[in-house]
Design a protein with these regions (language model features):
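Histidine-centered, transition-metal-coordinating active-site segments
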Residues: 10-354
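Active-site alpha-helix of zinc metalloproteases
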Residues: 1-5
Length: 354
């Protein structure tokens, strides 16, 4: 578990999940797939040589199978590997709505970003978590602590990861990110692990800065100048619409609407002469999914001691008990010329017209 915790994000490229969504998607993979390739490839020898834990030496002949670590870092199955039962019950501690990863990044990112996400009683959640015959289980006495934690995750998501300025930067980066990485990496990371390992935020920003300062290649120079504009926060997209809804009133199917679908429906509701205007959209349920608690698909297993019974709850169902608002849809444009037409179209698409 210590090794899996240490290496669970080893497959991340520069700019984390943005890299997944705007480069790795080309091959239908994500950082977990790359991480597994690293763990079972270049790192396998190092993992296999470990002979002790912080508490004691391993028994004679006892070693860590790198496949155990690779299995734990992702919810998808590891091809050709049948996990022993003891390993399968450990995975939810690293992958799930109240995983160790989630309980680590919420207070950490809240502190670093200067955003008060509210109290998070991690110790109570840990105290009342146990392994039952059904897997990782949370005693109902910790239910309120879990609600606080999920609410803090949602608050942090909207105030930091899905903040309007963050998303404006993301929209602008999306235009230059893929061609930049193609020049620096040159293909599928699984086929270029050596290059992938040295590709970091620092190396990327250093390279594009050099391009902007006078590359002989026109494409590199243009990309470098575009990156320089982002770094200087010369942002071209402006937020002109944001649709909110209460968690308990999320429209049926809203969480499955993609950016492309929302944009297409908006164009259908615009006057014919405006259907080709430039705008960008954001859908909270589809963007930054790794940090979005609304997109959790795993059930949480609760134990009810008075009834000696178990019940399963989806995260979204738990949110519907909380008085929280969610920003689901946004529209960005380079200016406000067609602001009222876009707002009218958005209200019609979302069924908010009065």
């Amino acid at each position: 578990m210590r090794i899996a915790g240490l290496l669970h994000d080893v497959g991340h490229g520069p700019f984390g999940h943005f890299f997944d969504e705007n480069y790795l998607d080309t091959w239908g993979i994500d950082h977990e797939v790359v991480g597994r390739a690293l763990i079972t490839g270049p790192l396998a020898g190092l993992i296999g040589e470990l002979g002790a834990s912080p508490s004691a030496d391993f028994e004679s002949g006892e070693r860590i199978d790198p496949r155990w670590v690779a299995y734990l870092i992702s919810s998808s199955e590891l091809e050709g590997f049948q996990p022993p039962p003891w390993l399968a019950v450990l995975r939810p501690a690293l992958i799930g709505p109240f995983s160790a990863d989630n309980m680590d990044y919420v207070p950490r990112d809240s502190y670093i970003c200067g955003v008060s996400a509210g109290p998070v009683d991690v110790q109570r959640i840990i105290h009342y978590s146990f392994i039952s015959e059904r897997g990782l289980t949370l005693h109902s006495h910790a239910a309120e602590a879990l609600y606080m934690f999920l609410n803090s995750r949602l608050y942090l998501y909207h105030q930091v990861y899905f903040h309007r300025t963050v998303r404006r930067i993301d929209l602008q980066l999306r235009e230059v990110f893929r061609p930049t990485i193609e020049l620096l990496l040159g293909g599928n990371p699984l086929e270029h692990l050596d290059r992938y390992l040295v590709l970091t935020e620092w190396s990327l920003l250093s390279d594009v800065d050099r391009w902007a300062r006078g590359s002989d290649d026109a494409q590199r120079r243009e990309l470098g100048e575009a990156w320089a504009a982002v770094v200087a926060r010369k942002l071209k997209w402006k937020l002109i619409y944001q649709g909110h809804t209460d968690a308990r009133d999320i429209p049926s199917g809203a969480l499955g609407v993609t950016r492309a679908q929302f944009a297409s429906r908006l164009r259908d509701h615009l006057p014919p002469h405006l259907r080709e205007i430039a705008f960008e959209v954001d859908v909270a349920a589809q963007e930054s999914r790794a940090f979005n608690p609304m997109t959790e698909t795993a059930d949480i297993l609760f134990y009810e001691p008075l009834e000696d019974s178990y019940r399963q709850s989806r995260v979204l169902d738990l949110f519907k008990r909380l008085p929280v608002r969610m920003a689901l849809f946004r529209i960005f444009a380079s200016d406000e010329t067609h602001r009222h037409d876009l707002i009218r179209a958005a209200n019609e698409v979302l069924g908010l017209a009065t």
